Amino acid sequence: MTVPTPYEDLLRLVMDTGTPKADRTGTGTKSVFGHQMRWNLADGFPLITTKKVHLKSIVYELLWFLRGDSNVKWLQDNGVTIWDEWADADGELGPVYGVQWRSWPTPSGEHIDQITQTIETLKSNPDSRRIIVSAWNVGDIPQMALAPCHAFFQFYVADGKLSCQLYQRSADLFLGVPFNIASYALLTHMVAQQAGLEPGDFIWTGGDCHIYDNHVDQVTEQLSREPLPYPTLKLNKRESIFDYTFEDVEIVDYRHHPAIKAPVAV
C-alpha cells in the first residue's frame, strides 16, 4: 500500500525552494506562500508517523477550545503545557480561539456560539455555503496573547459525508502543523458524528508555510525516515459535541518513528 505523504512533501518543498525571511520571533525562516494538502479520513487518521506526535496535547487542546476557555489552568491540570509560554501571570491568554469559537462578540453586546450554530446548520441546511467558524476577530486581536494561526474553517457536505477545510495563515511546519492536522481531523470526526454524517476529507490550506532556521536539522532528520501507514480513530459518541472527554478518543495502530525535539519560537 502506498502511504500518502502530503506533509512530508511540503517539508521537502520548503527545504528545497523556500525563500529566506525574517519573522516576528527574530529566529528566521524558509518560507513558501500558499499550499494545500488533502486527506480522505476514510483512509486513516492523519497523525504524522515520521516522528512521534504527542496525541494527549492535541486532544486536550481541542477540548479546551470547545470549552470556550482562555486560561491555561485547565490544560495544566490535565498535564498539557503547550500554551504556557504565551500566558500571563494569571494564566490568561485573552480572547483566543475558544472564546471566538464559542462566544464571538456582536456590536449589540450579545455573543455567537459558532460551534453550536455550525452543527445546527449542518442538520437543517447542509448545502449552505456559510458553514464557517472564524477565530480571526480583527477587533480582538490586540488583546490576544497570540493572533490566531489557524484562523478560519469551513464545512461542506456531499453524499452524506462531511469535509472540512482549514485556512492557516501562519504555519510552523515542523512543530505546529502536525498538531493542527490531527486536531482538525479529530474535530471533523466529532462534528460529523454530531450531525449524523460520515467523515469525508480534511483539507489544509496554508498561507505563510515556513520552517524555522533552528528546525532545519530536525526536518532533515525527519525527511530521512520512511513514512508508515496512518492509524485509525475510534471515537465514542456523546450527546453533545461539548461532552467529549479525552477517554472518548482512541487512536489504533499508531506506528511512528521516535520524537524529535526542537525549540519553540515565541
Swiss-Prot record:
Record family assignment: Belongs to the thymidylate synthase family. Bacterial-type ThyA subfamily.
Q: Which stretch is the leader sequence?
A: none
Quote the catalytic residue positions. Answer: 149
Query: Pathway, according to UniProt?
Result: Pyrimidine metabolism; dTTP biosynthesis
Q: Which UniProt keywords apply?
A: Cytoplasm, Methyltransferase, Nucleotide biosynthesis, Transferase
Function (record text): Catalyzes the reductive methylation of 2'-deoxyuridine-5'-monophosphate (dUMP) to 2'-deoxythymidine-5'-monophosphate (dTMP) while utilizing 5,10-methylenetetrahydrofolate (mTHF) as the methyl donor and reductant in the reaction, yielding dihydrofolate (DHF) as a by-product. This enzymatic reaction provides an intracellular de novo source of dTMP, an essential precursor for DNA biosynthesis.
Which CDD domains did the record assign? TS_Pyrimidine_HMase
**What is this protein's name?**
Thymidylate synthase
Q: How does it assemble?
A: Homodimer.
| This protein's GO CC annotations | cytosol
The organism that produces this protein has a lineage beginning with: Bacteria, Bacillati, Actinomycetota, Actinomycetes, Mycobacteriales
Q: Which residue ranges run through the membrane?
A: none
Tell where it localizes. Cytoplasm
Where does the chain bind dUMP? 24, 129-130, 169-172, 180, 210-212
GO biological process per UniProt: dTMP biosynthetic process; dTTP biosynthetic process; methylation
UniProt catalytic activity: dUMP + (6R)-5,10-methylene-5,6,7,8-tetrahydrofolate = 7,8-dihydrofolate + dTMP
Q: Which GO terms describe its molecular function?
A: thymidylate synthase activity
Highest taxon above the source species: Bacteria
Q: What is its EC number?
A: 2.1.1.45
- Residue sites binding (6R)-5,10-methylene-5,6,7,8-tetrahydrofolate per the record: 54, 172, 265
The protein's predominant localisation is cytoplasm
